[in-house]
Amino acid sequence: MFSKLTPLAETNIPPLLCANAAGRLLHSDSRQIKQGDIFVACQGEYTDGRSYIPAAIVNGAAFVFWDDDGNFAWNPEWKVPNQGIKDLKHRAGILAAQVYGNVSDDLKVWGVTGTNGKTSITQWLAHAADLLGEKTAIIGTVGNGFWGVLEETTHTTPAPVDVQTLLYRFRQQGATAAAMEVSSHGLDQSRVNGVPFRSAIFTNLTRDHLDYHGTMEAYGAIKSRLFYWHGLKHAIINVDDEYGAELAGRLKKDCPDLAVYSYGFSEHADIRIVHFTASSDGMEAVFQTPWGEGRCRTRLLGRFNAQNLAACIALLCANGYPLDKVLDVLAKIRPASGRMDCIMNSGKPLVVVDYAHTPDALEKALSTLQEIKPQGAALWCVFGCGGNRDRGKRPLMGAAAVQGADKVVVTSDNPRLENPQDIINDILPAVPHPERVEVDRAVAIRYAVEQAAANDIILIAGKGHENYQDVQGVKHHFSDFEIAEKALAERR
């Protein structure tokens, strides 16, 4: 059930080749190649990068690494220095790290994996570390860069060459640490091979991506790879999660040199939340830790965010920061974009935009809002499910909405290439009495804002920070936040 896979052995590149490559940027997308760059032509899941070698050369590639699987021959008309590398798909990250001079070894790289919570934790770690004097970069769902200045990205964990290029650039820009979301796809597809993780956090394991992994057992095994990583010093595990508790126990047996820190509400946790209170203004929590006990009051909402704070405390303290200073900076943290993001207008409903797109995340978001809901008020939930993804998750999302909300509006999410009504039809058996079924997500949001009472709470779930809606392969501009803000402004 648990994987002990470690990164592949270092790819040996002739020193002269490294000398020629030094100072150049590597890309695995020919469209990103500029004069003097290096093109890495891998075989991908859907496309073969070697077919783009001519385009990369036209764009100015000065060198090409290509996947040598025995069935490909270099065209002598491509008059560019090159080298074939066997199994390049899995070695690309290690290759790129070596070409860049392994500068990422000079960074404290913190990896965060789990079904939910990755974005919040990486954002908070970077912000908190910055406030503690550690210039910290971010790689993740919301974007790549530095806290408050992120460039949009298409993947939670980028392609392996892109990961190493980002780390190289961050180091050149003065970063001394990097907080990185590590997706199960990223681990399974070798996107993080070559990354020198120093500390890793496991948040939870709940149903998601079964269209890719097939079973929860396979999904969990992929996640566990990060904690058997060569050179890892700290494993920080949520033991309120069943799989996390099992993983923590296994790591303590398998890895005697690894510092394993458990966190959560559990009485067995090393970083234990011993007191928690919530209000519409935020929360207050008391943490017992190996470094002492302390209190933190923040504007964050939810028990799950208390767990996320505990993870941040564990990682930062394990990396040498004093507990009192860690708690001081965490008190200043704000929600990550699209994560329990509140829109408040006096005399109007409280609207909360959240990325919750799994049954567990939706259940937790709704239970958090039920805790702070005024007496006699209603909690609304506006949600849908993504197309071309795990269909079995759809009725579970519906059940979570019915269980946690007083009024449910079923709508579209990112239908992608599916008919949105078909997706809704998969949800509806679990939602026998919806307040409204509306394919048009903008109309659904406006309906909830218009119909809710002034003291009601509306959760708009599923898309969070996203500023697009994917319909038939085309991404149209769409922001839950913008639509809700406008609807609130127009409400009388």
Where are these regions (language model features)?
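Short, basic phosphate-binding NTP loop
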Residues: 2-111, 121-133, 268, 272, ...
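Phosphate-binding loop of NTP-binding sites
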Residues: 9, 90-239, 245-258, 310
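Short secondary-structure boundary segments
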Residues: 67-69, 182, 204, 239, ...
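Short, conserved loop/helix-junction motifs that constitute active-site signature segments
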Residues: 57-59, 75-77, 193-196, 226-231, ...
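ATP-dependent carboxylate-amine ligase
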Residues: 1-22, 32-38, 44-51, 61, ...
